[in-house]
């Protein structure tokens, strides 16, 4: 079955989000009914794709939030990126159906992040957007299998 493999593949994204976001461990633990411990959360994620989906749901908005913050803080970037199809809309699960388009847009977002914030801002934004890809990709697979996360 593919789903447990996908759940295990989500572990690196979850680990990096936990390391980068204070308070995320307790929020995830409350959402999945786990002990407030990174190792307990990761064990639950590896064993259950639904738990993986719920866990990723707790971090899934980070890329969009970082993107919106970038636009709000830097109007010149909003102008640079005015042709991006997702500039005013939340990233939807069906958007991931065309990863090629997403990759092109992600490159433009990276250019903008580099323009306004240097490498650290670029890395943070790219990681956040990559987490969104993993979250929505897993959510679509869970939905296809009859789960609703």
UniProtKB/Swiss-Prot annotation:
Its main location: virion. Keywords: Capsid protein, Outer capsid protein, T=13 icosahedral capsid protein, Virion. The keyword Nucleotide-binding does not apply. Homotrimer. The lineage of its organism: Viruses, Riboviria, Orthornavirae, Duplornaviricota, Vidaverviricetes. Signal peptide: none annotated. GO terms for cellular component: T=13 icosahedral viral capsid; viral outer capsid. This is Major outer capsid protein. Assembles to form an icosahedral capsid with a T=13 symmetry. Drives the penetration of the inner capsid (core) into the cytoplasm. It is found in: Virion. The keyword Ubl conjugation does not apply.
